[in-house]
Amino acid sequence: MIQWLSEQNCLFVEQPMPKEKIDEQAWLHERAPLPIIADEFLQRMPDVRRAYGLYDGINIKLMKSTGMREAYRMAILARALDMKVMIGCMTETSCAISAAAQLSPLAHWADLDGNLLISNDLFDGVKIVKGKITLLD
């Protein structure tokens, strides 16, 4: 399947195996034609080092990492290890998405559309305009 995704110009695969399957993930990492990005595997700073060698990059979610400082430190460490960085989210308000967007200069990819999944967002801090994250005044 990953080979097919590569042929379809997919950019990466986000954690295709359960986080407990470490040996299997190591095997896949050595053979995959696409970068594999850790998601459920990591939440905090020590997890970045554990992901090194198993994954090509990490998906940092602000709500899982306990906040801006830890997420920033995770991104800096991942880049120092020559890993790709993705800033992601869960279903969150645009207030949380706006905070996560502040880290996007450190990221190779940003997947910050969780606020689009809620109908009663109390905030108006970020919109997706023509495929780009736009922070409002």
Spans of model-derived segments:
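Metal-dependent enolase-superfamily TIM-barrel catalytic cores that perform enediolate-based chemistry
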Residues: 1-32
